[in-house]
């Protein structure tokens, strides 16, 4: 699988992910870009799960953003509804983290749209719990920037999770 983590701190939101694509117990690719910008660079997205499924969801989410003039929550809810109810989409296995300058969300195929705790940290994928734990500890105990926290959290997850590597893609937005 993978690790995607998002941290919002001091006027910045950062989403980062590793680059490993696995098929069973085999590493197929080590430098995949699982974090992207959508909607003219105003929205950051990262996926965990099937690569082909994620690209389908990226395209669909971008259409929802265009339809709702970039309103992140409305677009996420509409994507989650369609993902849950459409027969073809329901088979897609992936999770998304999406973020703009003001909010961050997780979108799942079960129709869930999850907002973060007060700490504004989100993580998904096989190494998500490791990255989430690391990010929370770093936010609480350091003055590191959001980007530095994402970098360190991905490194920790990559050191622990066999489905997460140390090749990272990181995108950020500032308020």
From Swiss-Prot:
Active site (record annotation): 2
Places the protein is found: Cytoplasm
Enzyme class: hydrolase
A GO biological-process term: proteolysis involved in protein catabolic process
Keywords recorded for this protein, A-Z: Allosteric enzyme, Cytoplasm, Hydrolase, Metal-binding, Protease, Sodium, Stress response, Threonine protease
Native organism: Histophilus somni (strain 129Pt) (Haemophilus somnus)
Keyword Calcium found: no
Disulfide bonds: none
GO terms for MF: metal ion binding; threonine-type endopeptidase activity
Enzyme Commission number: 3.4.25.2
Protein name: ATP-dependent protease subunit HslV
HAMAP family assigned to the protein according to its UniProt record, in alphabetical order: HslV
Purpose of the protein: Protease subunit of a proteasome-like degradation complex believed to be a general protein degrading machinery.
Activity regulation behaviour: Allosterically activated by HslU binding.
Predominant location: cytoplasm
Residues annotated to bind Na(+): 158, 161, 164
Catalytic reaction list: ATP-dependent cleavage of peptide bonds with broad specificity
């Amino acid at each position: 699988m993978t690790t995607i983590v998002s941290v919002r701190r001091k006027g910045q939101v950062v989403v980062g992910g590793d680059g490993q694509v696995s098929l069973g117990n085999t590493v197929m690719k080590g430098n995949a870009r699982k974090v992207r910008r959508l909607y003219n660079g105003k929205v950051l997205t990262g996926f965990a799960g099937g690569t082909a499924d994620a690209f389908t969801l990226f395209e669909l989410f971008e259409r929802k953003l265009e339809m709702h003039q970039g309103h992140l929550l409305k677009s996420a809810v509409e994507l989650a509804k369609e993902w849950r109810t459409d027969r073809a989409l329901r088979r897609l296995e992936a999770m998304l983290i999406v973020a703009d300058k003001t909010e961050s969300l997780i979108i799942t195929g079960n129709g869930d749209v999850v907002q973060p705790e007060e700490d504004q940290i989100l993580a998904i994928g096989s190494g998500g719990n490791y990255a989430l734990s690391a990010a929370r500890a770093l936010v609480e105990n350091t003055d590191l920037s959001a980007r530095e926290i994402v970098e360190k959290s991905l490194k920790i997850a990559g050191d622990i999770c066999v489905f997460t590597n140390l090749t990272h893609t990181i995108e950020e937005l500032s308020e």
